[in-house]
From Swiss-Prot:
Molecular function via GO: endopeptidase activity; phosphatidylinositol 3-kinase inhibitor activity; signaling receptor binding
Role this protein plays: Negative regulator of hepatic phosphatidylinositol 3-kinase (PI3K) activity.
Domain Kringle per the UniProt entry, residue ranges: 24-101
Alphabetical UniProt keywords: Cell membrane, Disulfide bond, Kringle, Membrane, Signal, Transmembrane, Transmembrane helix
Residues in compartment: Extracellular: 22-172
Cytoplasmic topological domain residue ranges: 194-267
Domain of life: Eukaryota
Protein name: Phosphoinositide-3-kinase-interacting protein 1
Record-level GO cellular component terms: extracellular space; plasma membrane
InterPro entries assigned: Kringle, Kringle-like, Kringle_CS, Kringle_sf
S-S bonds: C25-C101, C46-C82, C70-C96
Cell membrane among keywords: yes
Length: 267
């Protein structure tokens, strides 16, 4: 269990060192210095920053913290320094010696900004003293070509406003022509609607007359049996006439009655 805690502690220290990226060093004026050196030179000892800044002379300078390591709070070009006790007992500023850290590519900071006008000229290609350029005064108005190049971007709303202002008045003749064209277009539309309505009504009327004519032709060409109802047939009645006068019958031979030949019995 103790071994696990030791591994965790060492790993956390390594992660913190990598996070700071200095490995116990700090950057100052483009150089890497050790941050835990309490001596500016052999045989000397740095005073605590808070204790050394107790005097009125050093209160105006920022305090690096509650320690006695070499720092550079006032950005001294000579590098980090610290306060030491002088012969009179007054804190004295003393630059630190042999404070450099071994610089590596991984610890190298971004390139510092150029500190002189010469470096700026070399970087951005600005001509030096050999080539002198004459600039117009600040209050001078630009030329037409320059003004056209420096014009701001015009938005949609500004374009709409400009176009509305640039409209020209067509005059009375323009208004008359506009009204005339409007009336002509309306008349053409009304004529198209009326013509379509008349044509449609005429077609419907012709279709109706054609249907009536077809029905009449069908009625004429039908047979007679189509007009009779077989359930209501009329039967012809025959009249029989009976007369009371009988015509005498011709007596033929052999057709007389037996009574005539034999006579009455007992006669």
């Amino acid at each position: 269990m103790l071994l696990a805690w030791v591994h965790t502690f060492l790993l956390s220290n390594m992660l913190l060192a990598e996070a700071y990226g200095s490995g116990g060093c700090f950057w100052d004026n483009g150089h890497l210095y050790r941050e835990d050196q309490p001596s500016p030179a052999p045989g000397l000892r740095c005073l605590n920053w808070l204790a050394a800044q107790g005097s009125g002379e050093s209160l105006a300078q920022p305090s690096p913290g509650n320690h006695n390591y070499c720092r550079n709070p006032d950005q001294d070009p000579r590098g980090p320094w610290c306060y030491i006790s002088s012969e009179t007992g007054v804190p004295e500023k003393r630059p630190c010696e042999d404070l450099r850290c071994p610089e590596t590519t991984s610890q190298a900071p971004p390139p510092p900004p150029p500190s002189s006008t010469t470096e700026l000229e070399e970087k951005f290609g600005v001509p030096g003293d050999k080539e002198t350029q004459v600039f117009p005064p600040a209050n001078a108005l630009p030329a037409r070509s320059e003004a056209a190049e420096v014009q701001p971007v015009i938005g949609i709303s500004q374009r709409v406003r400009m176009n509305s202002k640039e409209k020209k008045d067509l005059g009375t003749l323009g208004y008359v022509l506009g009204v005339t064209m409007t009336v002509i277009i309306i008349a053409i539309g009304v004529g198209i609607v009326l013509g379509y309505t008349y044509k449609r009504g005429k077609d419907l009327k012709e279709q109706h007359e054609q249907k009536v004519c077809e029905r009449e032709m069908q009625r004429i060409t039908l047979p007679l049996s189509a007009f009779t109802n077989p359930t209501c047939e009329i039967m012809d009645e025959k009249t029989i006439i009976v007369h009371s006068n009988q015509t005498p019958a011709d007596v033929q031979e052999g057709s007389t009655l037996l009574t005539d030949q034999a006579g009455t019995p007992g006669a």
